[in-house]
């Protein structure tokens, strides 16, 4: 997959016609995947036009810039789907002034789309005045209706809410894969090591959606190898409580120094709430139970 980064008005010119998918594509969830699959059926090479920053955040529609996927994540997932081109447009305050007609004639047309594919909620141009109906006056457009699974909307906003309320399994179903974050392992207080339960403290590489406080089972990818893991999100109230929540990962079966290394962490299921134990011994006993459950449950 070729990645083309640009900022308006320096839009790349594509010589060959392509099927072009439009949207922010946060999460590359099942709804997004449906759009891309429909585009691939046209028989042309497929491009995805998205943005380096959330238009909803830049324009003030939402207050928090929390995402399900980083730019690197999106590139990986789109490449896995055999997308040919990823057009990454810089989106800042100035970009909010691009009119709907400028977007059509000066951004889309140079990319040479034979057909546009988008969700039914896609808007573009200053104040979001452009929509699929308006766009169809200038080029062929296929609108992919909002998808649902078991009555739940497959939408980035709804998936974020699921993650923030412990419902990781349902979020993963809508994503079509486990929710994954990437972070740098940083030095911590070494409290886990003192009870033979070492953890990797993560400094997130991107403003990912933070799961609600609690203990989760999942996987950690270290040096390209996938390990079972238990993940604590919170302030570890039993041992030197923190003011700011962190993500700590106990990587089952791994021994080694990974400080300063980037690792991937996948959340598979919620196990229990975070709680303050009466003693460190009681905490250790519970952690051992958590580890055993994760080892036996995860494949």
Residue ranges and their predicted role:
Residues 5, 9-70:
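N-terminal catalytic cores of NTP/NDP-binding nucleotidyl/phosphoryl-transfer enzymes
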Residues 29, 78, 116, 171, ...:
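Residue-level signal for inorganic ion chemistry
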Residues 41, 78-79:
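ATP-dependent adenylation/nucleotidyltransferase module used to activate substrates
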Residues 45-47, 84-85, 114-115, 140:
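Residues at the starts of beta-strands that form the adenosine-phosphate
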Residues 66-74, 96-104:
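Glycine-rich, highly charged phosphate/nucleotide-binding loops
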Residues 85-94:
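A conserved beta-strand->alpha-helix junction
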Residues 97-199, 223, 278-282:
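Classical nucleotidyltransferase
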Residues 188-299:
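Phosphate/ribose-recognition catalytic cores of enzymes acting on nucleotide-derived substrates
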């Amino acid at each position: 997959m070729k990645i083309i980064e640009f900022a308006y008005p320096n839009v790349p010119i594509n010589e060959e016609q392509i099927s072009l998918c439009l949207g922010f594509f946060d999460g590359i969830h099942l709804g997004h995947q449906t759009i891309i699959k429909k585009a691939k059926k046209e028989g042309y090479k497929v491009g995805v036009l998205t943005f380096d920053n959330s238009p909803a955040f830049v324009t003030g529609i939402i207050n928090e810039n929390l995402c399900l996927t980083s730019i690197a994540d999106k590139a990986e997932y789109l490449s896995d789907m055999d997308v040919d081109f990823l057009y990454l447009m810089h989106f800042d305050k100035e970009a909010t002034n691009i009119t709907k007609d400028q977007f059509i004639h000066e951004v889309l047309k140079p990319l040479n789309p034979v057909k546009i594919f988008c969700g039914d909620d896609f808007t573009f141009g200053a104040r979001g005045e452009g929509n699929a109906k308006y766009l169809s006056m200038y080029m062929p457009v296929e609108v992919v209706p909002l998808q649902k699974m078991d009555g739940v909307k497959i939408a980035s906003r709804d998936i974020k809410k699921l993650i923030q309320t412990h419902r990781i399994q349902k979020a993963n179903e809508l994503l079509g894969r486990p929710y994954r974050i990437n972070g740098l392992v940083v030095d911590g207080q070494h409290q886990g090591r003192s009870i033979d339960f070492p953890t990797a403290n993560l400094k997130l590489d991107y403003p990912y959606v933070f799961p609600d406080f609690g203990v989760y089972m999942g996987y950690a990818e270290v040096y390209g190898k996938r390990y079972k893991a238990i993940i604590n999100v919170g302030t570890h109230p039993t041992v030197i409580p923190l003011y700011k929540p962190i993500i700590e990962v106990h990587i089952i079966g791994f021994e080694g120094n990974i400080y300063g290394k980037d690792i991937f962490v996948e959340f598979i299921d919620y196990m229990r709430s975070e709680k303050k134990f009466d003693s460190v011994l009681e905490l250790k006993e519970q952690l051992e139970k958590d580890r055993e459950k994760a080892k036996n449950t995860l494949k």
